[in-house]
From Swiss-Prot:
Result, substituting residue 277 to Q: No effect on glycosylation
Modified residues (Phosphoserine): 254, 269, 273
Protein name: Equilibrative nucleoside transporter 1
Effect upon mutating residue 439 to S: Loss of nucleobase transport. No change in nucleobase transport
UniProt lineage: Eukaryota, Metazoa, Chordata, Craniata, Vertebrata
Species this chain originates from: Homo sapiens
Biased composition (Basic and acidic residues): 254-266
Amino acid sequence: MTTSHQPQDRYKAVWLIFFMLGLGTLLPWNFFMTATQYFTNRLDMSQNVSLVTAELSKDAQASAAPAAPLPERNSLSAIFNNVMTLCAMLPLLLFTYLNSFLHQRIPQSVRILGSLVAILLVFLITAILVKVQLDALPFFVITMIKIVLINSFGAILQGSLFGLAGLLPASYTAPIMSGQGLAGFFASVAMICAIASGSELSESAFGYFITACAVIILTIICYLGLPRLEFYRYYQQLKLEGPGEQETKLDLISKGEEPRAGKEESGVSVSNSQPTNESHSIKAILKNISVLAFSVCFIFTITIGMFPAVTVEVKSSIAGSSTWERYFIPVSCFLTFNIFDWLGRSLTAVFMWPGKDSRWLPSLVLARLVFVPLLLLCNIKPRRYLTVVFEHDAWFIFFMAAFAFSNGYLASLCMCFGPKKVKPAEAETAGAIMAFFLCLGLALGAVFSFLFRAIV
């Protein structure tokens, strides 16, 4: 079959849909992560209300005694960021691993649509609970359960999406990575707007989570339109057929008909005519992509080890009592990270260096280890062991920008190159394996975040 027979991605519709799907995979986690101020404030307020209620219930003699000062921060809010990261990343790892088996047994449309609908329901519940008063402990537990759920379904969604993108040209992994980067930027801007509105915290949070629901609904609509596009259907069928069958199949697609032989649900296939040793096949694929897989794992171990659990504890040295104090973490930590992470991911759409077989790629990945001491020596408070070396806000912003850009660019390179180091028929499995190692890095980073915070 000649290249002239290949359909074109008209108006970049498939590219844009994959961008929206990438946005949908990380939007839930980013909205929860960026809203840490809302969650910790709710925990502190609930704790204070409980203490006041306890005081009022005492007898007159006890109430006449001086009341003990209320704690500025209760134990649940103090550990919220670390526990949130752990509850997010461990389910992400587990369900990404399960997805490497589920993708051969559960239709792609069920995995993707089911995950998006489940995430939408969790956000609707979150928005409703903004209006419901809860004690600190029940609120903490319910929040962690929701984080577990959105990341479990997010793992299935992400693994399915990278496997799906592995069947298309390499440039179609880039919009997923770029969309994921924009998810963080979108969440950061939404939170800054909520703060700037001057509304009550509960009102701002309600609008914030409803906005997330609207974006997820838009993502679902985009996915439902994907199978209607000729370009997408063409690449979906390539792995099902030998070269001799592809021209006949293309003619059917161009006429809007579905090929009848070897056709399963769009995006999912298990060819009965080509039995293989699945375990041996996965080992062979892993051997081919091992450097890239371990590279993406290391990238996210360092990233999640520091962000957000450690970086949100950095305090401004110049804000004083100005409004910059309220915006310092949303802007310097979340917005800066998400802008530069998105720029790094997006750059791979037009520029890919080093190549997939270059030794420079793993070398640059290992070099990111330098960001651990650089960020730990910023103005983190409270601190017990390390001294502050980089106190000024500008140092922290500069380190966050470089930290984020290198994360987005190098991770996107690894995810783009992984499925292209194996045969086209193995690309979906390679994409799922790469997604698993990405999530392994996230889980390891969540564990290391406790260590990194403890040594400060």
